[in-house]
Amino acid sequence: MARRLSILKQPIFSTFNNHLIDYPTPSNISYWWGFGSLAGLCLVIQILTGVFLAMHYTPHVDLAFLSVEHIMRDVKGGWLLRYMHANGASMFFIVVYLHFFRGLYYGSYASPRELVWCLGVVILLLMIVTAFIGYVLPWGQMSFWGATVITSLASAIPVVGDTIVTWLWGGFSVDNATLNRFFSLHYLLPFIIAGASILHLAALHQYGSNNPLGINSSVDKIAFYPYIYVKDLVGWVAFAIFFSIFVFYAPNVLGHPDNYIPANPMSTPAHIVPEWYFLPVYAILRSIPNKLGGVAAIGLVFVSLLALPFINTSYVRSSSFRPIHQKFFWLLVADCLLLGWIGCQPVEAPYVTIGQIASVGFFFYFAITPILGKCEARLIKNSNACEARSVLASFLTSIGLLWW
């Protein structure tokens, strides 16, 4: 026992001990707080499966599609690696989106955790970029045309747009140079995400985790191990079952059948659809007819998320005690689901109009956030004043009865 304690005092092990074993955690956190560790698990799965897949993948336009088929047919366990990697990306986004909306509901972006939130938004942006360039690598029809459409959006940037597109492509069209660049970046970015995740964790542990009540307490806390560890372990088991259902029974249900057709620059798919986790942002992009306006709207999405901690005016963190904000939060959730549905529909009426209305609704939430905090503060103040008057009236009535 003494030897174990002496080892834990060494610099590297003490850091590990302070952040993952003895880390003081609020005793009332729920299972919603387990999605952070699940996101870390998903990242590890993606990195490990990606490294092994890269050993058999060939980043060349003539061989990329065939190398993926080689992995599926000839590499022992290759089908499992590919399906774990492809479905692992979807699981990663599911977990991160739930983690994100939990933070939004319980006010985890509020002071003093602004840096934690901003790092989380940066990680989300890195995930989207990594997933997009990874989707290009199989070099199927949807991969090729998705890369062509999305990268060409950079041409909307004034003055330097065309230069950026040429630099991204490595030429004047999506070709072998593009595939090589995307493969290199797709291999690199997960490690950058891992580094950003460590910074995210360090920033979180500077002030401690939030809790469902949204209050600060340095007394009512417990060690992460074994209490929170066991709670997270339950979530890991449930996640493993959910993940396994997709990997073993429905591995292609979240993909697109057109991507099993080799890329053909001479044949455009009837409907170019990105992966499901891009659909809300893709719907906002499509809702604006002007290309530059669409790109600006995507940028505004992430600017709004980054600005949220600084435009928040509420003194109460948790939406459990903010009934007005709670309603707007659920409207935002419904709006994001609607945007996701619109993103996979054809660009025609009435989907375009619905997408435009839903896009306005998305940004309306961030526009009204500062007003909600002030309105709720005024309601609380008036409620306290009414309660004080009621107590005073009751007290005076009691005094009068006693005197009588």
UniProtKB/Swiss-Prot annotation:
Localization recorded for this chain is: Mitochondrion inner membrane
Q: How is the cofactor bound?
A: Binds 2 heme b groups non-covalently.
- UniProt entry keywords in alphabetical sequence: Electron transport, Heme, Iron, Membrane, Metal-binding, Mitochondrion, Mitochondrion inner membrane, Respiratory chain, Transmembrane, Transmembrane helix, Transport, Ubiquinone
User: Quick one: which residues bind a ubiquinone?
Assistant: H205
Identify the domain of life.
Eukaryota
Cellular component GO terms, alphabetical: mitochondrial inner membrane; respiratory chain complex III
What cofactor(s) does the depicted protein rely on? heme b
The Gene Ontology biological process terms listed for this entry are: respiratory electron transport chain
InterPro entries to which the protein is assigned, alphabetical: Cyt_b/b6_C, Cyt_b/b6_C_sf, Cyt_b/b6_N, Cytb/b6-like_sf, Cytochrome_b, Cytochrome_b_C_euk/bac, Cytochrome_b_N_euk/bac, Di-haem_cyt_TM
> Where, by residue number, does heme b b562 bind?
H85, H186
Q: Does the keyword Membrane apply?
A: yes
GO terms for MF: metal ion binding; ubiquinol-cytochrome-c reductase activity
Its placement in the membrane is given as: Multi-pass membrane protein
One short Pfam name that applies is Cytochrom_B_C
Question: Which residues does heme b b566 bind?
Answer: H99, H200
Q: Has the keyword Iron been applied to this entry?
A: yes
Q: What else is known?
A: Heme 1 (or BL or b562) is low-potential and absorbs at about 562 nm, and heme 2 (or BH or b566) is high-potential and absorbs at about 566 nm.
On assembly, the entry states:
The main subunits of complex b-c1 are: cytochrome b, cytochrome c1 and the Rieske protein.
Task: Spell out the family assignment given in the record's similarity comment.
Answer: Belongs to the cytochrome b family.
Q: What is this protein identified as? A: Cytochrome b
Annotated source species = Marchantia polymorpha
Cite the source lineage: Eukaryota, Viridiplantae, Streptophyta, Embryophyta, Marchantiophyta
